[in-house]
Amino acid sequence: MLLDKTSFYAEAGGQEYDTGNIFIDGVADFEVTNVQVYNGYVLHTGRLKYGALEVGNEVFSTYDEVRRSHLRNNHTATHILNFNLREVLGDHIDQKGSLVSPNKLRFDFSHKRQLSLDEVATIERMSDDWIRRDVKVYGKELDLQTAYKIPGLRAVFGESYPDPVRVVTLEHDVDAIVKDIENPKWRRTSVELCGGT
């Protein structure tokens, strides 16, 4: 099903899609089981539970908030992990890919050697600390040229980003960072170009 606008997140950048429902109250209910982008169109796939839908119908859509919440949490965890990998292993760490699903995440990165058990334990301890502190997540669209001026900004090497681009930070508001954009202290927090939830 195609909509003129949608609140559903289509699978992209390693993050899985939203699920939910598109409906006309009491008339029809379409269960969305997958959301993908094809040729610039967001396609909601699933099954019609009851009723009928036609081109031009005004519908309501609602994504599964529990699934989205788990996706959002694991997505934020990839930002935390990316930052802590760089802190422990060095600035040469580059994200190569990721998988964000409701019940797990995978983070692919480049490094010169195998991690030691002590490094893994340190990264895990630091990540747990960020989570325990329940740091605030900020997101804002910036023009690409401004975003690239932020010290410590992380991006996926080889990825093509739109202009403007969404910048996601932990602990510090994006507006505060932009007001003091060349401050080297931004290297001590997670600042990334991001297209996820």
What are these regions (language model features)?
Residues 1-197:
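A glycine- and charged-residue-rich anion-binding loop/surface
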